[in-house]
Amino acid sequence: MIAETIGWPQIAALLVLAQRGAEELYSARNTKALLAAGAQEAGASYYPVVATTHLAWIASLFFLIPATAPISIVLAIAYLLLTVARYWVIGTLGRFWTHRIITLKDAPIIRSGPYALVRHPNYVVTIAETFLLPAVFGAWALACIMTAVWTAVLMYKIGLEDAALAARRQPQLEPTG
């Protein structure tokens, strides 16, 4: 019975859930430290939408993809490379990486690592992951639907983030390296 309901899609969903749980702990620690240092949170009301969307994506992987779904090794490798990119983003931001929009007045705006290539690399990775993981298991409709939902949610978050950072994007505050 378990073998018929638990397969690679469900294992992948549980691994992603564990990974995101660990990231949430790191984010919460960074958030607490930044707020203690005088940082401000912007757009706090959007956060439950982001969290719910993310959990819905993980749940859809677990419940909507058959346990016996075929696996595309090429897409699985691409997804694993995105995981490396995710941790490159997290490592580049270090103590400033959070799930929430937290701004610390005199903190530098990071322009190194993936931020030298793309303005919002974490969101690019998230959207690509949202599409790729269901696609690994041939769940193309799920990949398209959840990617569209995530894209809408993240576009809203990007607007909030850009507005929160606008005052800090003055040329004299931009680091050179």
Predicted regions and their residues:
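Hydrophobic transmembrane alpha-helical segments in integral membrane proteins
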Residues: I2-L17
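N-terminal signal-anchor/start-transfer transmembrane helix
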Residues: A13-S27
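Hydrophobic residues within the alpha-helical transmembrane core of Major Facilitator Superfamily
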Residues: A18-G21, A59, F131
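A short, structure-level motif marking secondary-structure boundaries and short turns
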Residues: L15-V16, S60, T147
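Cytosolic-biased juxtamembrane loops and peripheral soluble domains of multi-pass membrane proteins
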Residues: L25-Y46, P70-G177
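Long, highly hydrophobic alpha-helical transmembrane signal-anchor segments
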Residues: M1, A44-I73
